[in-house]
Amino acid sequence: GHAGQLPIDGCGRRDRSPFESSLPSASAEHENVAETSTPDGDDLLPDVPPEARPQHVAIIMDGNGRWAQRRNLPRIEGHRRGVKALRTTTELCVRLGVKYLTLYCFSSENWKRPQPELNALMNLLEQYMVEERGELVRENIRVSVLGRREQMPASALREMDKTVELCREHSRLHVCLAINYGGRAELVDAARNLASA
């Protein structure tokens, strides 16, 4: 297995980690964030010393469409549930004192999906940026966007840029959204850089 990977139902398959039994699942099936800690604020990981807790959690958001299809739901419903799981995951990271959360949201290979699904995904991204902005500011969460801006809809870029700018100085948790990233894209960029050198 891969050390330090937490399985998040609805966000793809991951190897089991030593933290699995200590953390509640953040999925469409386990959406109640209120159950993740006791009312008096007890530590979520009482048996794990602070120095042994992860400072950086990375999640590859994969499998949401398949999750929905297995339940006879539209693929976009799986993506919506994935966004909901992200809210839970972000809250857990804040409560656990995680400093960095990297979310691999949309790879460059995802452009091969059917256009209606792409439109829905871009709308979800834009909606997330607008709807979560206030909470990100209140919780002192910084947001960065990694990846290529090419092909991204102007309205989604505008909302991402607004959120990044509003949260630029925040420091409680740094959420890095990897959007339009991928190995092939990186190879193309590297080849272009070499050719122009």
Where do the language-model regions lie?
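Flexible, compositionally biased loop and terminal segments
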Residues: C11-R14, P18-A197
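Low-complexity, intrinsically disordered or signal/transmembrane-proximal segments
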Residues: H2-Q5, H30
